[in-house]
């Protein structure tokens, strides 16, 4: 993601070949083969695996039925707007630490300045030596509301947070059967979630009916769909059910649609229960919310994940507004110097014309040194000796263009300075007032919820 950001492959720019992205990433940051890099890029582009897609893929990026993506030389990609605005925002404002890459020729971010808990929204699955993690995906709107609730009351319990986060929200849909187990799972960070596919009954002509599966357990992604179709066929062939006439997979880009045509008079409820019992239409998602927190792997509760995220947001905001405040103070210093210079511009011009070098002129502006400067009068020399511009102001004066002396330009400079002072006051308030900083963070969360959230 960072490499795509650095290459300028933004959401509002043209797609670039995946091979170009993979090659650049491998050469700069990950010299361990291209397959793992491309596989990662592909997963981040698959909307059936991610709650929020991080990469906008163009071409064949695989299917929910387990078809692999086309070779990287054929596909193209770019960042999504979500990634650019929520995952990579303010990288130029010193909000995170950077470290050297493998050969110390580049800098790479140690973390990304994620503005929402991506660990909850997009989930995570993986294994390492002696440990594994499995975190389900969640709804962005619900997660944002939970984060805001924690910020308003950090004594809130996990059970109270579940007023906002009802449970997992998988890209493939599905129904959580054991909802009563969710509080314990979110409290301990471990457990098993029973998922069922969503089955609808459609009436056909002649009194016939058909079952239509529109949502599936997340665990059925890939080969699981094909296995389900085979399992249903086996139920028919082994005479365990005689109610099924035909089964077809009519899924498309619009969504899942698996149709099971039934005989007239079929026992619908009995058949649904059989499908849940004998196939993966009901399956288990194992939860183990293991994550690296403060450099150590730790199994976290729902509240702990949100707590770590909120702490990180305050760290990001503190670094961001400290950087902005520093820049505004520097700008104010320069503006004050230019405004002051305009009031004594004739004297400054006399200093410049009488100086033998830029060094002499700067010394006069900063320290009032007049020894190496020719003045028209003793009064001018006396006034010059009283000048005390800062180094930054002196540089700005020496680089100032003559058009800045126009009356309207001076007036505009004064208005600009007033705006700078307002910004300084605002940034100081944010940095010195918890409620102000929390308000800014929550405003950003609301904007992300409005733009990227879904029901």
Please report, for each region that a protein language model flagged, where it lies by residue.
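Catalytic phosphate-handling regions of large nucleic-acid enzymes and associated NTPases
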Residues: 1-189, 257-259
